């Protein structure tokens, strides 16, 4: 077993997280995050519609395709949106340069967002930036926009590390038939807000500059494809289970679950000194129930002085998920291999407990999981993988 204790130095720079909103929907999402005081990130808005962009609250604003569109928008044509982004490629590159992680948000199916998102993602990847897109999909009754959105999604997938899709059709199902349009779209924006805030909380400490190993975040989210994100909050007895159930059961995401997840990032936040080892164990057991045998799981525990002592907040981001109807590809040589026994299988799990003093990291081998004395020596909960629905 490897045990490392690092004391963070105040001179260490935290990871730089930027969020860029594209088109009308993406720019509205930026306004929502600014209004909700999401900290630790830099906001950028880019649009072909000059009038709409002028009203945006992002610190950095980019007018796309001034020569092409004259500030009048892309007219729901993604080809124009793409060309506009190419016209201002240098401005986009300058705005996102220096980021360790970039969130791209937009509403797919229109002109500016659908066309420019793949361009922005391609630029980000060329700069070595961890790139995650959080996008909405049109209502099924929107006809042509649905097909335009799907074509845009296929292009976007080629360049992003992880992709979170929020279908508009889920909004009424999840929120009820009486929900207003404003409330529904705000709920969709909040998925992005929670994802950004959750990652920011994992990577930075508000009271002291502590940079949790950003390489761990990259391990979970790099080149992983479809992803899901959820956040849960609970108080009182059984708070850990209730918050975890909320986090993994987001009704707004696109028919994805933790089943078969290959990468999971878990962040647990409580008041100082209020997280129990048994709660940490319970959270991780729930997460591991449906995971892939080769799961990469990273978890952090943060302390927030503003939270009550009986409260807990849990953020979970799972990556490497299958889309609805997708089937895993299994190479022929793997079919002939002898499957390891249940006792031999283990997950690569790293734990990081963050306090105002520093970071404690522990790496467990497969043998360590079967050696209770090793776990007891370091007061680590027995986080054991449970095979779920093995016949599936």
Curated annotation (Swiss-Prot):
<dbReference type="InterPro" id="IPR003008">
    <property type="entry name" value="Tubulin_FtsZ_GTPase"/>
</dbReference>
<dbReference type="InterPro" id="IPR000158">
    <property type="entry name" value="Cell_div_FtsZ"/>
</dbReference>
<dbReference type="InterPro" id="IPR036525">
    <property type="entry name" value="Tubulin/FtsZ_GTPase_sf"/>
</dbReference>
<comment type="similarity">
    <text>Belongs to the FtsZ family.</text>
</comment>
<dbReference type="InterPro" id="IPR024757">
    <property type="entry name" value="FtsZ_C"/>
</dbReference>
<dbReference type="GO" id="GO:0032153">
    <property type="term" value="C:cell division site"/>
</dbReference>
<keyword id="KW-0717">Septation</keyword>
<keyword id="KW-0547">Nucleotide-binding</keyword>
<dbReference type="GO" id="GO:0051301">
    <property type="term" value="P:cell division"/>
</dbReference>
<dbReference type="GO" id="GO:0005737">
    <property type="term" value="C:cytoplasm"/>
</dbReference>
<dbReference type="Pfam" id="PF12327">
    <property type="entry name" value="FtsZ_C"/>
</dbReference>
<dbReference type="Pfam" id="PF00091">
    <property type="entry name" value="Tubulin"/>
</dbReference>
<comment type="function">
    <text>Essential cell division protein that forms a contractile ring structure (Z ring) at the future cell division site. The regulation of the ring assembly controls the timing and the location of cell division. One of the functions of the FtsZ ring is to recruit other cell division proteins to the septum to produce a new cell wall between the dividing cells. Binds GTP and shows GTPase activity.</text>
</comment>
<comment type="subunit">
    <text>Homodimer. Polymerizes to form a dynamic ring structure in a strictly GTP-dependent manner. Interacts directly with several other division proteins.</text>
</comment>
<feature type="binding site">
    <location>
        <position position="189"/>
    </location>
    <ligand>
        <name>GTP</name>
    </ligand>
</feature>
<dbReference type="GO" id="GO:0000917">
    <property type="term" value="P:division septum assembly"/>
</dbReference>
<keyword id="KW-0963">Cytoplasm</keyword>
<dbReference type="InterPro" id="IPR020805">
    <property type="entry name" value="Cell_div_FtsZ_CS"/>
</dbReference>
<feature type="binding site">
    <location>
        <position position="145"/>
    </location>
    <ligand>
        <name>GTP</name>
    </ligand>
</feature>
<dbReference type="InterPro" id="IPR008280">
    <property type="entry name" value="Tub_FtsZ_C"/>
</dbReference>
<feature type="binding site">
    <location>
        <begin position="111"/>
        <end position="113"/>
    </location>
    <ligand>
        <name>GTP</name>
    </ligand>
</feature>
<feature type="binding site">
    <location>
        <begin position="24"/>
        <end position="28"/>
    </location>
    <ligand>
        <name>GTP</name>
    </ligand>
</feature>
<keyword id="KW-0131">Cell cycle</keyword>
<dbReference type="GO" id="GO:0051258">
    <property type="term" value="P:protein polymerization"/>
</dbReference>
<dbReference type="InterPro" id="IPR045061">
    <property type="entry name" value="FtsZ/CetZ"/>
</dbReference>
<keyword id="KW-0342">GTP-binding</keyword>
<dbReference type="InterPro" id="IPR018316">
    <property type="entry name" value="Tubulin/FtsZ_2-layer-sand-dom"/>
</dbReference>
<feature type="binding site">
    <location>
        <position position="142"/>
    </location>
    <ligand>
        <name>GTP</name>
    </ligand>
</feature>
<dbReference type="GO" id="GO:0003924">
    <property type="term" value="F:GTPase activity"/>
</dbReference>
<dbReference type="InterPro" id="IPR037103">
    <property type="entry name" value="Tubulin/FtsZ-like_C"/>
</dbReference>
<dbReference type="GO" id="GO:0043093">
    <property type="term" value="P:FtsZ-dependent cytokinesis"/>
</dbReference>
<dbReference type="GO" id="GO:0005525">
    <property type="term" value="F:GTP binding"/>
</dbReference>
<keyword id="KW-0132">Cell division</keyword>
<protein>
    <recommendedName>
        <fullName>Cell division protein FtsZ</fullName>
    </recommendedName>
</protein>
